[in-house]
């Protein structure tokens, strides 16, 4: 890639601005139409600005459709097919693995990094989020990314040996100041939606009053009337200082969860930067969060299978920047389902492109 491209992609002035109000009304832009994909063409002569790699087909489709561009196929019949397109002045390449995990993602990211010479290696997709620090649909930006199951295993236990890959400081600042209001997947909630969020937290054994997402789902001033209404309807009962579900309340939220097969289209999600721990297996164990804290990462926000690989490939191939953005689809608990998977994949792609555009600006 030429020097002119390097200067044009990332400048020192790129930063995000804070705007919008979670309690206000948002004029949401219409969802873009599914993007066109044109026939195979020659490999880009001058490389690309950003290479986006996903692990799953659903994540790939979300990243493809959220870009709002016309894509061009490359090597459609080869071992590593990919698409190219342009968005916000950035030349993009998009590819996917055929299955989850580092062993599938690493060779694709490495091969295309050598061929396309990107200035940023990125990934969008889904992850598990810490149930007390994130809500389903929230978007986590990895900082740092690390492999949590690297280390030494003996008959008496496991000792971690973690290599951390921190996010660029300027990018971290932009993430911390980023406000997702205005993205197609962002929307406020109220009334019955707030009640359902409250009841679902109780159903999962959480304390809604102390949950980090409470101000977004139950705006200031709404709580007293809401709990009074739910209590009057016989859905909750106060025991000591904590609200508990009654049988009627449990039946209502279980019926709602069982009937919600498509998941949400819009949520008041937050964009959070924090540690993302990558492992080699899908986790359905709520004890994972305490174990990760016991290994020394007390503020871990998310668990996935590929973030550390993306950061490692960027480091080893001397790619100037990397960015892993993933939407929370569950809390790594045994009751996990795919209700939020579609939303999480789409929201993460929208946030990824928005962050890239702001950095480009």
Language model region names:
Residues 1-41:
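Long, low-complexity intrinsically disordered regions enriched in small/polar
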Residues 31-323, 327-361:
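Intrinsic-disorder/coil detector with helix-boundary
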């Amino acid at each position: 890639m030429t020097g002119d491209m390097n200067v044009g992609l990332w400048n020192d002035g790129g930063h995000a601005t804070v705007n919008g109000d979670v309690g206000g009304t948002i004029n949401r832009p219409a969802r873009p139409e599914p993007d066109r994909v044109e026939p195979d063409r020659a490999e880009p002569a001058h490389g690309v600005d950003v290479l986006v790699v996903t692990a799953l087909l659903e994540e790939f489709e979300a990243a493809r459709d959220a870009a709002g561009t016309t894509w061009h196929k490359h090597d459609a019949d080869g071992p590593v097919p990919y698409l190219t397109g342009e968005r916000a002045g950035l030349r993009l390449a998009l590819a996917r693995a055929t299955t989850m995990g580092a062993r599938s993602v690493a060779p694709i990211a490495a091969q295309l990094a050598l061929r396309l010479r990107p200035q940023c290696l990125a990934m969008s997709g889904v992850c598990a989020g810490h149930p007390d620090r994130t809500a389903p649909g929230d978007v986590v930006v990895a900082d740092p990314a690390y492999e949590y199951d690297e280390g030494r295993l003996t008959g008496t236990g496991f000792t971690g040996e973690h290599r951390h890959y921190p996010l660029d400081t300027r990018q971290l600042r932009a993430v911390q100041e980023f406000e997702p209001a205005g993205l197609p997947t962002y929307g406020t909630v109220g009334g019955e939606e707030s009640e359902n969020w409250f009841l679902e937290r109780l159903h999962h054994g959480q304390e809604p009053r102390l949950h980090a997402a409470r101000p977004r789902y139950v705006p200031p001033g709404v709580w007293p009337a809401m709990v009074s209404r739910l209590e009057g309807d016989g859905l909750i009962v106060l025991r000591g200082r904590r609200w508990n579900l009654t049988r009627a309340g449990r039946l209502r939220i279980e019926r709602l969860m069982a009937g919600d097969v498509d998941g949400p289209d819009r949520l008041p999600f937050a964009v959070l930067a924090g540690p993302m721990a990558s492992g080699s297996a899908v986790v359905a164990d709520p004890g994972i969060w305490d174990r990760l804290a016991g290994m020394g990462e007390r503020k871990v926000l998310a668990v996935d299978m590929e973030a550390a690989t993306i950061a490692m490939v960027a480091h080893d191939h001397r790619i100037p920047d990397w960015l892993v953005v993933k939407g929370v689809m569950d809390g790594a608990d045994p009751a996990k389902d795919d209700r939020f998977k579609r939303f999480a994949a789409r929201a993460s792609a929208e946030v990824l492109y928005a962050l890239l555009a702001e950095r480009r600006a």
